[in-house]
Amino acid sequence: MLNKKEQRLRRSRQTRARIALQGVERLTVFRTNLHIYASVISADGGKVLASASTAEKEVRAQLGVAGKGACVDAAQLIGKRIAERAKAAGVEKVAFDRSGFAYHGRVKALAEAAREAGLQF
């Protein structure tokens, strides 16, 4: 029987296999207890085109002293930043790769903020 982490990794492998068949760039999300990370990866999977995370110095300063990287507000900020950076890199349409995490809470907030900022998926 698989533990919780192994189940998540299995789901993420299945998702990435489906996205690879589509042949589009993917917006991948990784979530920890402290931070959230987002990257836009090329269609062949070999190159990171844009990235953003709550571990960045500018983001931590913007969130303030009380602002933690592990909140919905921080995820929304990262969603907007990744959309801006992806558009600057010439990427308009992506496939959303939630890395096996549930589409809920911070992952959902990041996705919705990226959509509002103009990224299509």
UniProtKB/Swiss-Prot annotation:
InterPro entries: Ribosomal_uL18_bac-type (IPR004389), Ribosomal_uL18_bac/euk (IPR005484). Keywords: Ribonucleoprotein, Ribosomal protein, RNA-binding, rRNA-binding. One of its GO terms (biological process) is translation. Gene3D superfamilies: 3.30.420.100. One of its GO terms (molecular function) is 5S rRNA binding. GO terms for cellular component: cytosolic large ribosomal subunit. This is one of the proteins that bind and probably mediate the attachment of the 5S RNA into the large ribosomal subunit, where it forms part of the central protuberance. Belongs to the universal ribosomal protein uL18 family. Part of the 50S ribosomal subunit; part of the 5S rRNA/L5/L18/L25 subcomplex. Contacts the 5S and 23S rRNAs. This is Large ribosomal subunit protein uL18. It comes from Leptothrix cholodnii (strain ATCC 51168 / LMG 8142 / SP-6) (Leptothrix discophora (strain SP-6)). The lineage of its organism: Bacteria, Pseudomonadati, Pseudomonadota, Betaproteobacteria, Burkholderiales. The gene is rplR.
